[in-house]
């Protein structure tokens, strides 16, 4: 791989290869990002605009079509929404606050409100809000009705909007061509992994790199602030340019107090953020006029920071739980695992991403459930006991795991990798009060690969929370955000994909499996051909999706464009089993 063409390692995106799926887009875009501020300042997002075309009023245009073009032009935020303001009367152009709340609608329906005349007409605009766009391109998923009026006036023979609500309304379809989701990466609190912070960026800007770096130095979105580190000091600045060879160059000032380790971690942030958004390296990085780190005087490649690769996949053979036993795929057959896992009835199990440590829920029938933890060849250690336990889930590595007891008590299990001794710490779940409904029961709780978030199913609905760290080192759930509006209360299983999206299995025969982005901006139904709901378990290794439906353990090859049906996993034929991959 040449320096000039170095790119980030990319995992296979489920939604890009499933040509047979029905895309149900909750597509969204970014909030208004300043286009005319100095790119050297922390608060800046991009240099001058690229001049991407937006619709303009045409001579003699009918009022309803002009209103529709206004909404399309509203998707172009440059110069204080100059493109959209061309559709307003002169007086309204100065009064409309285009920095007001921005709402994304699933559709925009327009109908006249009473009889109009040659000089005035009022239209009623309706739709469903699928999300709002916050500062820095943060998408906040919602699903509420929207309805309001837009008044129009004929000015010198041309229709213009004379009165409208103080809000920016966008049709989701406009985002397909004008906005793209990008990941800004921040280190976890221990500096061992990069955590994605998904943002929506307007594409009509000259420098994607400048936009990304400005968002990075501005810091993580509010929801992530207690789950990640922000290495850039408040008074620091960053300037983005291209060097003489056309390669990206990022020059920081104000980093004198950062340690060598922190500078290397910041370099990883920048390189993987740019590489993940198709800004090709190599990358020149400097801090206060000197190389970012003393040991790196040349340009940076992703290979130089491979230990922080946010897309790395843990390759392990498929395992499965069936009839209380744990099996491992071994060539053309499934082999029952021996050791302590074979000495009790295993209801569910999780495999750590490293070191092959198992966390298993044991017990059956009316007996209490017991969590047991240990490597395959070791003696296990007993931990949480309750009437019911969710399938356990590991964090970033084998030093911490999580389980939910009796649908409500979330416990973090800490494990000493040397001695194998475990401890238990209660996770503060007081933010669950923000979830609607009574008798809230957590049936699924799965921690992301970077350890910073968890997806959970509460009474059939899908939520994402951050795992915040408190001052005393314990964990606390961040505010739950419902991301699965498309599946309603039909969800029965969920797990993380390698690209950071969430796979969801449901009890709906017409839509048994979904892929949902972590910010709730996009939901996509995956083909259900040859599946029978409910889908009680889901997992993916990037090349195959595994699910347990009403009949068997099934697989779908996402790397093959010829795949049209789910097939039974050959090694587990005749057994109804749940898939197990490394967390």
UniProtKB/Swiss-Prot annotation:
Residues 38-63 are annotated as: Disordered. Its main location: membrane. It comes from the Bacteria. It is found in: Cell membrane. Keywords: Cell membrane, Lipoprotein, Membrane, Palmitate, Signal. One of its GO terms (cellular component) is plasma membrane. A lipid is attached at residue 30 (S-diacylglycerol cysteine). It is a lipid-anchor. It holds the Pfam family Gmad1. Transmembrane segments: none annotated. A lipid is attached at residue 30 (N-palmitoyl cysteine). Residues 1-29 form the signal peptide. PROSITE patterns: PROKAR_LIPOPROTEIN (PS51257). HAMAP family: LpqB_lipoprot. Belongs to the LpqB lipoprotein family. NCBIfam families: PRK13616.1. This is Lipoprotein LpqB. The gene is lpqB.
């Amino acid at each position: 791989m040449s320096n000039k063409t170095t790119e980030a390692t990319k995992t296979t995106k489920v939604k890009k290869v499933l040509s047979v799926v029905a895309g149900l887009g909750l597509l969204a875009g970014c909030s208004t990002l300043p286009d005319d501020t100095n790119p050297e300042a922390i608060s800046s997002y991009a240099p001058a605009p690229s001049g991407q075309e937006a619709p303009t009023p045409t001579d003699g245009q009918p009022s309803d079509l002009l209103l529709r073009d206004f909404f399309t032009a509203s998707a172009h935020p440059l110069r204080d929404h100059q493109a959209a303001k061309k559709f307003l009367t002169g007086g309204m152009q100065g009064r409309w606050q285009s920095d007001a709340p921005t709402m994304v609608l699933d559709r925009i329906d327009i109908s006249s409100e009473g009889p109009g005349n040659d000089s005035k007409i009022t239209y009623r605009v309706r739709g469903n809000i699928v999300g709002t766009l916050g500062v820095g391109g943060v998408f906040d998923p919602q699903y509420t009705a929207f309805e309001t009026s837009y008044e129009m006036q004929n000015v010198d023979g041309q229709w213009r909007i004379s009165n409208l609500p103080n809000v920016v309304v966008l049709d989701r379809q406009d985002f397909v061509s004008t906005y793209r989701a990008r990941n800004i990466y921040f280190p976890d609190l221990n500096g061992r992994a990069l955590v994605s912070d998904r943002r929506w960026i307007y594409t009509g800007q000259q420098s994607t790199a400048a936009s990304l770096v400005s968002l990075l130095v501005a810091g993580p979105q509010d929801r992530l602030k207690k789950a990640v580190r922000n290495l850039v000091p408040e008074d620091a600045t960053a300037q983005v340019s291209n060097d003489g060879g056309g390669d990206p160059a990022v020059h920081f000032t104000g980093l004198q107090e950062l340690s060598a380790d922190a500078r290397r971690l910041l370099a990883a942030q920048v390189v993987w953020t740019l590489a993940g958004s198709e800004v090709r390296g190599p990358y020149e990085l400097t801090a206060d006029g000197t190389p970012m780190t003393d040991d790196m005087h040349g340009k940076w490649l992703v290979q130089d920071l491979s230990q922080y690769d946010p897309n790395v996949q843990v390759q392990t053979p498929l395992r499965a739980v069936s009839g209380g036993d744990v099996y491992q795929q071994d060539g053309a057959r499934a082999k029952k695992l021996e050791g302590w896992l074979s000495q009790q009835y295993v209801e569910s199990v999780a495999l750590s991403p490293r070191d092959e440590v198992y966390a298993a829920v044991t017990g059956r029938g009316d007996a209490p459930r017991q969590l047991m933890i240990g490597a395959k060849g070791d003696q296990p250690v007993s931990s949480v006991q309750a009437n019911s336990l969710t399938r356990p889930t590991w964090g970033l590595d084998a030093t911490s795991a999580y389980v939910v007891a009796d649908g409500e008590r979330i416990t973090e299990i800490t494990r000493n990798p040397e001695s194998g001794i475990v401890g238990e710490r209660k996770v503060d779940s007081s933010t669950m009060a923000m979830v609607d409904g009574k008798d809230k029961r957590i049936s699924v709780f799965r921690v992301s690969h970077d350890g910073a978030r968890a997806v959970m199913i509460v009474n059939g609905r899908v939520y994402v929370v951050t795992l915040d760290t408190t001052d005393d080192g314990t964990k606390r759930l961040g505010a739950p955000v419902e991301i699965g509006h498309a599946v309603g209360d039909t969800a029965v299983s969920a797990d993380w994909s390698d690209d950071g999206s969430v796979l969801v299995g449901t009890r709906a025969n017409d839509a048994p499996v979904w892929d949902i982005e972590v910010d709730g901006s996009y939901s996509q139904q995956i083909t259900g051909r040859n599946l029978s709901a409910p889908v009680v378990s889901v997992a993916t290794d990037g090349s195959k999706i595994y699910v347990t439906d009403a009949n068997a353990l099934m697989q779908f090859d996402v790397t093959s464009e010829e795949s049209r049906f789910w097939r039974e996993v050959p090694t587990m034929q005749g057994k109804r089993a749940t898939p197990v991959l490394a967390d």
